[in-house]
Swiss-Prot record:
It is a multi-pass membrane protein. Residues 15-148, 153-304 form the MARVEL domain. It is found in: Membrane. This is Myeloid-associated differentiation marker homolog. The keyword Transmembrane applies. Its main location: membrane.
Length: 307
């Protein structure tokens, strides 16, 4: 009789039993439950619903891929730096899931036309979205660089700030582009240039770190980071001054007070009146300026980095 050979699948189960591995399993489960409940209710149509659904599904898919890669032990074969990619994704996942957790109930729970059963499903989905966000927050806190630890740049405070800076810039682009709020004066176009240039440079830094391409730079990576952070602070400081002046000062064609016909939907980014959008851009500009100042301070203190 022919001898039958039993196929044994060997995997790195220790990664799944570690605190970070358990967190990633919970992230996959929580995200899956969240978008499954939302799909079951059928209450996610429109651009806002699509955005929330994309956040949950994207985080679920990438977390599952990370679990599979670490279980099979093929991190070294991946075309990305495994010291930088998981923490970068986890930070983006925190911001994406947090945004979806805030936006979804504002957009859909305020509608009283839904039955109590549908609302119950929506509430449970929001709870699981909160749990998903919390799991990613804990993962970031566990995997970020500790004092004195040599790790990937994206696990350091400046690396995490880069993720925050790009995410805030994306929100600014949403508010500033539909309708265009920068067409009224050339000074506002300068502000748009500031947001675009700093966003692109931050994305380039993230790509260089995740792709392990920092050696391509014509200068030392830490000097490039410090110089870029200083440039970003100066540019955002100018935007922080220029945007309010040319948006709210009547002498420069702005609107000082909120118009009486200004109506906004708190959960719909696309249904916010122009004046509220201008306020949001001013606030987000200030927040990003603070982030870049912190980035500059930490980058100046970061002496030795292994990417």
């Amino acid at each position: 009789m022919p001898v039958q050979h039993r196929t044994t699948v060997v995997g790195n189960t220790s990664t799944l039993k570690s605190p970070v591995g358990i967190l990633r399993i919970l992230e996959v489960i929580f995200a899956c439950v969240t978008f499954s409940l939302v799909v079951h209710t059928g209450r996610w149509t429109g651009r806002i619903g699509d955005l929330c659904m994309f956040c949950w599904c994207f985080c679920f898919a990438v977390s599952l891929v990370i679990l599979i890669v670490e279980f099979t032990g093929v991190q070294n074969r991946m075309p990305v730096s495994w010291k930088n990619f998981p923490i970068t994704f986890a930070m983006y996942a925190v911001l994406m899931c947090l945004s979806a957790t805030v936006i979804y109930p504002l957009q859909y729970l305020e509608d009283k036309a839904y039955s109590s059963e549908v609302r119950n499903y929506q509430i449970v989905a929001i709870v699981f979205s909160c749990l998903t966000t919390l799991a990613y927050i804990i993962e970031v806190s566990l995997t970020r660089a500790k004092p004195g630890e040599v790790t990937g740049y994206m696990a350091t405070t400046p690396g995490l700030l880069k993720v925050l800076e790009t995410f805030i810039a994306c929100i600014i682009f949403v508010f500033i582009s539909d309708p265009p709020l920068y067409d009224r004066h050339d000074a506002l176009k300068w502000c748009l240039a500031v947001y675009c240039i700093c966003f692109i440079l931050s994305i380039v830094v993230i790509i260089l770190c995740v792709g392990e391409c920092t050696g391509w730079l014509p200068c030392a990576f830490n000097k490039f980071l410090s110089g870029y952070a200083l440039l970003a602070v100066l540019m955002y400081a100018s935007a922080m001054i220029i945007w309010p002046i040319f948006s709210f000062d009547r002498k420069h064609g702005g609107t000082a007070s909120r118009p009486s016909n200004c109506r906004s939907s708190p959960g719909n980014l696309y249904a916010v009146c122009e004046w509220d959008k201008m306020v949001a851009v001013a606030v987000l500009t200030a927040v990003n300026l603070i982030a870049y100042v912190m980035d500059l301070v930490y980058s100046a203190r970061l002496i030795f980095i292994t990417v």
